[in-house]
Regions:
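Membrane-embedded alpha-helical bundles that constitute the cytochrome b-like, heme-associated redox core
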Residues: 1-245
């Protein structure tokens, strides 16, 4: 039935969204290793590519995570589009079939618009981020090298400061998406009760702020010269490892 389909779509969005949340929290943790210096950061990136070898091939874990990410992305975006289309159709057929207080309705509409356009911004940003730091097809700031993640990051923000604006906008969208998404996902999964609502709101706010601050810390430090520039020459050539990012 339509009701069961709607519930299923919301659950798909909730589970896939929570997976994304855990992934970006781990990613943010990894990015903060930049402050420990070039060897630590590049070594960490190299470790991700050799983790669980020889049980898995080189970069095996990363490819597994990428496959899961693609599946979650398709599911999340597909479910969001399905719900948006259904809601639009319902409003067109019977605009006020379910009456709400004006303030509640306006807040709901605002949240939905924010999530929808925030999702579009994040999708475009993911493509840009992959092109810049994974495939190295977009290299603002200079010549990037596979395996020299520290240098690539430095060039991307120090020598091409306009990329900072891209990341600021995208990560603000991520923070808003996470703030609303944590609440929405837990509500969908039945984890919110009256007594825990204040706590959930606090957690959602802290998660959103933590993501924004953690992800913007490195670009900000690079832009204002608060971290060391990469050493001359190729870190990859000196260490014989292909770390990447």
């Amino acid at each position: 039935t339509a009701g069961r389909t709607t519930v299923a779509m919301k659950r798909i969005m909730a589970y896939s969204g929570l997976f994304f949340l855990f992934f970006v929290l781990f990613h943010a943790y990894g990015n903060l290793k930049y402050f420990e210096g070039e060897d630590v950061y590049n070594g960490y990136a190299a470790h991700l590519r050799t983790m669980f070898m020889p049980i898995l091939p080189r970069e095996g874990l990363l490819w597994i995570l990428r496959a899961i990410m693609v599946a979650c992305l398709v599911g999340h975006a597909g479910a969001a589009f399905h719900l948006w289309h259904r809601n639009n159709k319902a409003r067109g057929n019977q605009k006020y079939a379910v009456k709400k207080a004006h303030a509640e309705y306006a807040a709901s509409r605002y949240a939905n618009r924010t999530m929808r356009w925030g999702g579009v911004i994040l999708l475009l940003f993911i493509v840009w981020h992959i092109l810049q730091f994974t495939t190295l097809n977009a290299t603002p700031g200079g010549h990037y090298v596979h395996g020299d993640a520290y240098k690539n990051m430095y060039l991307g923000f120090h020598d091409a400061p306009w990329t900072y604006a891209i990341y600021f906008i995208a990560l603000a969208a991520l923070a808003l998406h996470a703030w609303h998404g944590v609440w929405s996902a837990l509500q969908t999964l039945g984890a919110i009760r009256g007594s825990v609502i204040p706590g959930v709101r606090i957690i959602a706010t802290l998660v959103a702020l933590a993501l924004f601050v953690a992800f913007m810390a490195v670009p900000t430090a690079i832009l204002f010269g608060w971290v060391d520039a990469p050493a001359a020459g190729s870190w990859t050539a000196l260490h014989g490892a292909v770390a990447g990012h």
